[in-house]
């Protein structure tokens, strides 16, 4: 889908055309799901958050002003939903600070079953705290600028830089320890 087509669909969706929003949903679904899966490492949670993201996007579509790409706007919503989810689960998260080996094995199996490869880097990445994992993923996998990430996560640019630095530092430390 080219930019003009996307802009046309966004405008039609803003005017109440549900078919246009459905087309946007289908176009961006896979991208958003993969982003959330990398972020959460939980397929069911990723699916749930994609649905919530599109619901919020649908409800607040009129507030999309086109200052950024539509996909950036969706990632911003998805990131905030994910971080909100993590805050709600903070007590439980503290008890289970790292992803269990069983969950990682399941994800590795799922990834390899689809013909992809689970690397040592993903192992180390999966152990990062979500506050660090999110900015590292947005910066180094998706290529967003620190400023864009700050807007998406509603944190200061300096905070983004320090979280990316700290996340990479932790990965390097683990790498050196092995």
UniProtKB/Swiss-Prot annotation:
Statement: the UniProt record of this protein carries the keyword ATP-binding: no
Miscellaneous comment text of the record: Negatively regulated by both YxlD and YxlE.
UniProt xrefs under Gene3D superfamilies: 1.10.1740.10, Winged helix-like DNA-binding domain superfamily/Winged helix DNA-binding domain (1.10.10.10)
Induction record: Positively autoregulated. Induced upon nitrogen starvation.
DNA-binding region: 146-165
Gene this protein is translated from: sigY
Listed name of the protein: RNA polymerase sigma factor SigY
Keyword DNA-binding in record: yes
């Amino acid at each position: 889908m080219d930019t003009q087509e996307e802009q046309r669909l966004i405008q039609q969706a803003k005017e109440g055309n549900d078919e246009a929003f459905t087309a946007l949903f289908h176009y961006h679904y896979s991208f958003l799901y993969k982003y959330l899966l990398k972020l959460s490492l939980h397929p069911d949670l990723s699916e749930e958050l994609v649905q919530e993201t599109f619901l919020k996007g649908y409800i607040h579509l009129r507030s999309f002003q086109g200052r950024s790409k539509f996909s950036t706007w969706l990632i911003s919503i998805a990131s905030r939903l994910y971080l909100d989810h993590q805050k709600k689960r903070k007590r439980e998260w503290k008890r289970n600070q790292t992803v269990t080996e069983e969950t990682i094995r399941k994800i590795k199996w799922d990834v390899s079953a689809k013909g992809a490869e689970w690397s040592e880097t993903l192992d180390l990445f999966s152990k990062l705290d979500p506050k660090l994992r999110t900015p590292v993923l947005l910066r180094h996998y998706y290529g967003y600028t620190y400023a864009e990430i700050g807007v998406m996560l509603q944190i200061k640019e300096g905070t983004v830089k320090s979280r990316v630095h700290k996340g990479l530092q932790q990965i390097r430390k683990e790498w050196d320890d092995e």
